[in-house]
């Protein structure tokens, strides 16, 4: 049962997240030979100020 976690800065619309989840499901199903019903996509909206690569705050562009 594939689980896919996607972390994004918040700000995408519900429609964009639905499209992303559907497209990711299609690719994982095709490549991993997994039934779509078994694939779970988690999209985490990260608020600005919660991501610190290399110890520095990352701001969305």
From Swiss-Prot:
Active-site residues, as the UniProt record annotates them: 2
Top-level EC class: isomerase
Gene3D superfamilies with a match to the protein in the record: Macrophage Migration Inhibitory Factor (3.30.429.10)
GO molecular function: isomerase activity
Keywords for the protein's UniProt record, in alphabetical order: Isomerase
One Pfam family hit: Tautomerase
Record EC number: 5.3.2.-
NCBIfam families registered for this protein in UniProt: PRK02220.1, PRK02289.1
Family: Belongs to the 4-oxalocrotonate tautomerase family.
Name listed for the protein in its UniProt record: Probable tautomerase stu1128
